[in-house]
Amino acid sequence: MDMYDIDFVSVGKHGVTLEEKLKESAQRVVDLADLVSGENFDVALSKHSIELPRVAFGLAIPSLFVLDNEHAMAANKLTLPLCSKIIVPSIIDEWKLMQYGANPNDIIKYNGTSELMHFNNFKFNENVFDDLGLDLPLQKTILMRPEPSLASYLNTDCRKSVLSPVVDVLKEYANILILPRFKEQAEIFEGIKNVTILKPPVDTSSIIKACDLVIGAGGTMNREAAILQTPVISCYPGDTLSVDQFYVDNGLMYRTTDLEDITKQALSFIVNPHKPIELKTDNLFELIVDKTYELGNSKK
């Protein structure tokens, strides 16, 4: 938001332990309620926010919820029963969402994933590496994104990463760029040969497109790489998300958690990247705008 000079108000912060997560979530509800109740909002629009649908429901504001993770049990149970409309990728099984309390009549499906929105006005910066002053001694460059260790749906140690053994092998063959999620993750990879730790905010879209390969233990950046046609390996340590399977099925993502397989495929991809693959999707931007206006008009 800062990078694109967009005015915004930041509300709340994350917790690490279960107790901290609960307390911080409760505080975000309070802070959001104070912010929202002082204004005349017509619609609450969120992407997998736990707090905004709850605040909107309590203040009788219609809410439009964009969902992409059917495995986020806690978040889905706390939000889906309260949402006016839920926009989901067609590949996600709506019966799974109904188990969390979603009304099937409120589910709106589209072909694609939410990451399509990230590239509506994307302009590739071919000089992104030079602009960042990166020292890249090797011919090939791999971008890596560690797992979302602090997320409620993934119970992992934030001081470790599934990418560590991958880095140990591939650092001899390519420059490694690490985009950590928080300070503890950055510390895991500090001081390693041929490894550069990126410090946000950076133009991640241009970095993804400029790299020869992306290896991600999360989700969003992997799907962005698939859309940009950069070879990508997903080693997400949880169950495979349907939105990831969408790109696997279309030949734009390779999914594995086996170290030997990851390194083998990585070396293959940086030498022989796949040819461009046509991806047919719906216009998610138009869908969100249309449904936002529909909900806003329904309140009047």
Language-model features: where?
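Active-site and donor-binding regions of nucleotide-sugar-utilizing enzymes
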Residues: 2, 6-101
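Catalytic donor nucleotide-activated moiety binding site of glycosyltransferases and closely related
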Residues: 2-23, 144, 167-198
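Active-site regions of enzymes building and remodeling cell-envelope glycoconjugates
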Residues: 4-9, 61, 101-112, 188-201, ...
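Donor nucleotide-activated moiety binding/catalytic core segment of transferases
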Residues: 28-36, 183-221
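A donor-sugar binding/catalytic signature common to diverse glycosyltransferases
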Residues: 44-50, 55, 65-67, 207-244
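A nucleotide-sugar donor-handling region in carbohydrate enzymes
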Residues: 87-158
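Leloir-type glycosyltransferase catalytic cores
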Residues: 102-134, 250-300
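Charged helix-capping and loop-helix junction motifs
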Residues: 156-164, 196-199
